[in-house]
């Protein structure tokens, strides 16, 4: 069985972390490179940067952030936000990203995913899916894709879309439950499992983590290959080491061998 991965996520806007990271010894909690270095030292398996810069004029800042992070960190780096064309992916990979996450552009043009996977390899193409439950009480579970930060309904079935994306070459699915995001009530396990069981690519579960048990549930019950969380790590509620130790104690296979993440 593949080892489960723990992935912190940083929202970056105009080169700054939007939700500050509460590491005591950080010189500048708003500097994504400082935050990334802290997570690298703490034993995170990967790191996700989400560039939420509104203006395309400021896109160059994320390339600088990635380049500086890649120089100083050894964990794989996934970058998403504003990826619309092959040239964007090329620039991100050249800057030092290991994987690139495609969201709205994949919904608008599924063939873009196939083109990207063909050019760069499916191992570095992640498709980010934001899904909301649309089925009512007593109906079979059904989720739809939403875009533009969960504001725009597409009418596209989330499970079918995930299948299509993996068929087109996505090497991984970053799955966020819009219903659970920010609630600290745990992942939408039914959604996560439905998509994990429908595709042959790993699922990164996202949205709703409030406790360490939620991380265990994402892997054990949701069949995800990785768990993503933000606030529980950023604000010091739990450390990466505590998360991994808790997951290992629950019987999940974890990477616990680096100096930064020994329980």
Swiss-Prot record:
Originating organism: Mesorhizobium japonicum (strain LMG 29417 / CECT 9101 / MAFF 303099)
InterPro entries tied to this protein: Aldolase_TIM, His_biosynth, HisF, IGPS_HisA/HisF, RibuloseP-bd_barrel
Listed HAMAP family: HisF
Pathway(s): Amino-acid biosynthesis; L-histidine biosynthesis; L-histidine from 5-phospho-alpha-D-ribose 1-diphosphate: step 5/9
Organism placement in taxonomy: Bacteria, Pseudomonadati, Pseudomonadota, Alphaproteobacteria, Hyphomicrobiales
Enzyme Commission number(s) of this protein: 4.3.2.10
Family the UniProt entry places it in: Belongs to the HisA/HisF family.
Entry keywords, A to Z: Amino-acid biosynthesis, Cytoplasm, Histidine biosynthesis, Lyase
Residues of the active site: 11, 130
Keyword Kinase assigned: no
Gene3D superfamilies per UniProt: Aldolase class I
A Pfam family that the UniProt record links to this protein: His_biosynth
Role summary: IGPS catalyzes the conversion of PRFAR and glutamine to IGP, AICAR and glutamate. The HisF subunit catalyzes the cyclization activity that produces IGP and AICAR from PRFAR using the ammonia provided by the HisH subunit.
Primary location: cytoplasm
Gene: hisF
Locations listed in the record: Cytoplasm
Enzyme class: lyase
Protein name: Imidazole glycerol phosphate synthase subunit HisF
GO BP, sorted A to Z: L-histidine biosynthetic process
One of the record's GO molecular function terms: imidazoleglycerol-phosphate synthase activity
């Amino acid at each position: 069985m593949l080892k489960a991965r723990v992935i912190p996520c940083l929202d970056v806007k105009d080169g700054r972390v939007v939700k500050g990271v509460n590491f005591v010894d950080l010189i500048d909690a708003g500097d994504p490179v400082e935050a990334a270095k802290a997570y690298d030292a703490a034993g995170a398996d990967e790191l996700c940067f989400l560039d939420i810069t509104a203006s395309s004029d400021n896109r160059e800042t994320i390339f600088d952030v990635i380049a500086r992070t890649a120089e100083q960190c050894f964990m794989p780096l996934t970058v998403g936000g504003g990826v619309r064309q092959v040239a964007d992916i090329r620039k991100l990979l050249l800057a030092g990203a290991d994987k690139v996450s495609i969201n709205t552009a994949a919904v608008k043009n599924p063939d873009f995913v196939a083109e990207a996977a063909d050019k760069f390899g499916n191992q570095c193409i992640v498709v980010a899916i934001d899904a909301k439950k649309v089925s009512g009480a007593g109906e079979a579970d059904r989720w739809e894709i939403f875009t533009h930060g969960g504001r725009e309904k597409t009418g596209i079935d989330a499970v079918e879309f995930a299948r299509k994306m993996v068929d087109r070459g996505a090497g991984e699915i970053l799955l966020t439950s819009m219903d659970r995001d920010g609630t600290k009530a745990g992942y939408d396990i039914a959604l996560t499992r439905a998509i994990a069981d429908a595709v042959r690519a790993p699922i990164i579960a996202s949205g709703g983590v409030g406790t360490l048990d939620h991380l265990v549930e994402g892997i054990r019950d949701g069949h995800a290959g990785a768990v993503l969380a933000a606030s529980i790590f950023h604000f010091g509620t739990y450390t990466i080491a505590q998360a991994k130790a808790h997951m290992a104690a629950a019987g999940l296979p974890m990477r616990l061998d680096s100096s930064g993440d020994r329980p």
